[in-house]
């Protein structure tokens, strides 16, 4: 069994505490948790928010999916450095990129990724700073309308480097294109649609189609006496 984060082996912790799981077996389980440096190798908060930053147009295309030890990371870092200097010279500000369309796109992408539910609070905070009217109800609508397409743990079977190898975020966005506002601007100087126009899905089991999703509904906002506002 493969793990992409520390939450995977937690179910064996009671056995370790009770003494029914030998220490050497626990150490074997621990060694399977991390495959490289970097963030946890599942669609947790870090992987989710870097992806949403890319969808909102605030990072270079494909940057969010590159594994920590991949040489493409160095290339993208250099390209990002060059690009941000040009953006400063051109007086392009975050407010020129992040708007209602980009935030709605990010919400839908987060749902399709099977991403962290922390994305809801982060996106709402970003929206408020950007002057957008995006709300928790809007996030709930996305959760009910958009299926999970990324077959990545914890919602699916695979781990992040396999998602990257299958085409990563740009490829998944091509599957989701009918739900997106593709004219949204990005820091590349091109639109979101133009950025993903050449992306291809390398493994249709890792990045599913709208007709064959991992799950038909991803999330719903719950309201009740403990959380009347959701």
Regions flagged by a language model, labelled:
Residues 1-230:
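Catalytic or ion-coupling anion/metal-binding cores of large enzyme and transporter domains
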């Amino acid at each position: 069994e493969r793990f992409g984060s520390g939450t995977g082996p937690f179910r064996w912790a009671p056995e370790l505490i009770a003494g029914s799981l030998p220490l050497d077996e626990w150490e074997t389980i621990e060694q399977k948790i991390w495959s490289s440096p970097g963030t946890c190798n599942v669609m947790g908060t870090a992987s989710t928010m870097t992806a949403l930053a890319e969808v909102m147009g605030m990072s270079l295309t494909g940057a969010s999916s590159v594994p920590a030890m991949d040489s493409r990371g160095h290339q993208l870092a250099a390209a990002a450095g060059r690009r941000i200097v040009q953006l400063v010279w051109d007086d392009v500000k975050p407010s020129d990129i992040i708007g209602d369309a980009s935030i709605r796109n990010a919400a839908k992408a987060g749902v399709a990724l099977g991403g962290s539910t922390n994305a809801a609070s982060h996106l709402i905070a970003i929206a408020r700073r950007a002057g957008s009217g995006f709300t928790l109800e809007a996030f709930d609508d996305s959760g009910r309308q958009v299926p999970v397409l990324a077959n990545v743990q914890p919602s699916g079977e695979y781990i992040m480097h396999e998602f990257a190898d299958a085409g990563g975020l740009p490829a998944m966005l091509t599957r989701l294109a009918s739900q997106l506002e593709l004219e949204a601007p990005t820091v590349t100087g091109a639109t979101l649609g133009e950025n993903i126009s050449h992306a291809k899905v390398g493994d249709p089991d890792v990045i599913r189609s709208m007709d064959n999703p991992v799950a038909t509904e991803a999330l719903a906002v719950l309201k009740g006496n403990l959380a009347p506002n959701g």
